[in-house]
């Protein structure tokens, strides 16, 4: 689902104009992004939590030349932990019916 798909679905169920819904959705995403960029976590009850984590520096390997090591510096990443309701709903899925996009 894309942002546009989300806007259309919300507009249909709420009978609001798509342009108004798009503005609210975009503003919501902008605020979430800004809070995370300031190092703040975000919690949506029953949905999940966005957290800022620091990955420690480590040594990696070049897959094309396994004998060559590469230093990977520490970095800040966003981690999402699904809430109880989302976890339970996803667990109800039939694994055979899930279409996975492998990026190809």
Question: What do these predicted regions represent?
Answer:
Residues 1-104:
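Strongly charged
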